[in-house]
Swiss-Prot record:
Pathway the protein contributes to: Metabolic intermediate biosynthesis; chorismate biosynthesis; chorismate from D-erythrose 4-phosphate and phosphoenolpyruvate: step 7/7
Quaternary structure annotation from Swiss-Prot or TrEMBL: Homotetramer.
Listed name of the protein: Chorismate synthase
The organism of origin for this protein: Nitrosospira multiformis (strain ATCC 25196 / NCIMB 11849 / C 71)
NCBIfam families found in the cross-reference section: aroC (TIGR00033), PRK05382.1 (NF003793)
A GO CC annotation given for this chain: cytosol
Amino acid sequence: MSGNTFGKLFCVTSFGESHGPALGCVVDGCPPGMELSAEDIQQDLDRRKPGTSRHVTQRREPDTVEILSGVFEGKTTGTPIALLIRNEDQRSKDYSKIMDTFRPGHADYVYWQKYGIRDYRGGGRSSARETAVRVAAAAIAKKWLRARYGVVIRGHMAQLGPVEIPFKQWEAVGENPFFSADPDIVPSLEEFMDKLRKSGDSVGARIRVVAEGVPVGWGEPVYDRLDAEIAYGMMSINAVKGVEIGAGFASVSQKGTEHSDEISPGGFLSNNAGGILGGISTGQDIVVNIAVKPTSSIRLPRRSVDKMGNPAIVETHGRHDPCVGIRATPIAEAMLALVLMDHALRNRAQNADVACTTPKIPGHTGPREGQEEGPSDSEPKVEFADDPEPDEA
């Protein structure tokens, strides 16, 4: 199996299966000299780990991280950082009934056809358990980005099934199991999930993740566009079926006068582009939404086939998330952090000596997430000259 490495300069190679002895990764390209401890990484792992509420899988994994290399006397050395997370609560017998059949909506069938063998225990390599090491690696990236550039990456659940979750305050996100930025809606979300869990069914979710403080200039203009690599990273997360950056699909119904983010000396007047133009960061917040599909492992009977191609009825028992989106927020944050870290290093390597005399435009003239965009009360009035004749293509 190839394709287990993410990134070009900040590279993360992961390994391990859901019911194997351990999961792990090797992080190559971390700059030397940054203070780093297991506690720095554990904070984000604790946000993602299973068994934290009745609304997620009851598999009890401490997800304790071990740093095996790349850190000496509390600081990164610039050599590969190896991280290990041991599996401690596997219950493989729960999967004995599906060892010869394929779960609808799961990777079981395509793994079998591609490799001629599959680890049916918890989905093996296709399990979302693999994302634990992404979160661990990204904790390193988050710390470096914040220390070096002041970049802050955070996310929240924006929709649970049919329930839209309005944004109210970042402070609320860490105070409930849904990563909801609206504390008032949490009781309704709990009631919704209690009914869903009793029914044996599952549901999807939408997660929004925002990166603040990203400087102008990160990203490449053609194949390695920043937004393209963000979409690539987000789509690599298990169960993600859609990615929006900025206005996303809403831009279809917008007009040019509405979608194009006007610029004044005081800042951008909107952020429909989601902080990226031409594949390069603008200095505005980078805003990403992802769609997470309903969990395919459900207790309700579903039609499928067995290894011989015969009809079969599949009911999946065991410990599963009725909504994998509930724990997806730190994973989405992680993938955005990994992309930004990689591009930060790439930009530094190629463009460190570039000096532009044009003043940098502030990313915002008004309020941020959850508030209406637009000029602030102190925004100076600017008169714009008539547009010049367009250049020939």
